[in-house]
C-alpha cells in the first residue's frame, strides 16, 4: 500500500472560486520578491503572474518560493511521518490489521496514512511529539498524561479508528481503545522513509508540512500530487508556503559550521530552530507563512559554508509575527557576513518595520556566510527574528 492514498473522492478538493482567492508573494531566483494577485502555469513550462495588474513572465526554474496566508495550527491531532511530513486532522478510521490510519484533514479531505510511515501520532496539545523518546528495547508505546509529565505504556498497536488508538499495554490480557485526547502521543520505532523524492514542500494554513509534486497553478488553486500519487487541488486561501526544490540549497537543510547564542544576561533564551520560529511554532512574518527559514532569538550567530556550485546567497529578515502578542517594541541589529566582511546590515531594526532584503550576495563554494542578530534597545525582550528562506543559489550548467 502506498504511504498515503485517497478514500473515494474526498482527497481531491474542487474549489469553486472563479478567481484566485488570495494573493501570494513570489520569491524568484534573481533575488526579487513580488506580490502577485494571480499565478498560473507549471514548473515545466513556467508561470505567468499578475503583479499590480500587469502580466509578469516567470520562466521555468525561476520560482523558488510561494508565500500565501499565515499558518495557524488548529486543535487537531497530528500524524508525524518519517522524513518530516506532518498531517493534521481528526482520526476517523483505519483498517482492522492496524496498517492504516485515516486522517480527516481540513484542507485535503480524508487521507489514509500507512502506519509503516508513522513516527508519531500526537494529541492536539502536543506540538513536538518526537521529543518523547522511546526507551531502548521498546518499539511501540503510548505516552499517557500523568499528574506530572507522562506515563509510558509499552505494548502493541492494534488498530486506529474513530474512538482513537486501540492498544495493548504489556502485561495486559487484551487491547483497549485510548481516546486521542487521553494520551499525549503514540510513538513507533522503525518508520519507513518515503519511496519517492518530492519536488516541493508545502505548508498549509493549518500547519501541515507535506512533500508534494506541483502539477499546475490555476485560478481555483494549486494542483498537486501528494505521496503515493494522490491528486489534490489546494485552495489559494489554504496555501501557507510552497518551496520548490532544485537550483538552491536552503540553510535550514544544512548543518551550521558554527553556532553562538546567548541572551542579554548570558543564558540562551531560545535556541535557533529550522523551519520554525524561535519558540518552535510556525514561521510567520508580515502576515504570511515562511515555510523554509530559520527562527532565532538574540543574540544569535549562525555560520554556514557555501556548498559546491554556490554562486550567490539571498535571504530576508523580519520579526516573527508572534511578537505582536507580547505588547513589546523589540529592536535588534542584524547583519550578514561573507567571510569577515559585512555585506548587509540593518541597525536598530524594529518590530513593525517591513522585512529587510539582502539582495543577491555573490559567494563561492567554501565561503562562510554568517547570519547575526544582536541585542538592540530594550535588552533581548521579544527579539524573535526570522531569517526568511536563507539560501545559496547554485550556478547553472
Model-derived features: where do they sit?
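Extended non-catalytic domains of envelope/secretory-pathway proteins
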Residues: 22, 26-30, 37-44, 52-249, ...
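Secondary-structure boundary/capping motif
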Residues: 33, 110, 338-340
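Gly-Asp-aromatic-enriched flexible segments
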Residues: 176, 180-200, 220, 225-397
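Hydrophobic h-region of N-terminal signal peptides that target proteins for export
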Residues: 8-20
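Intrinsic disorder/low-complexity segments enriched in polar/small residues
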Residues: 21-22, 346
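Bacterial N-terminal signal peptides that target proteins for export
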Residues: 1-8
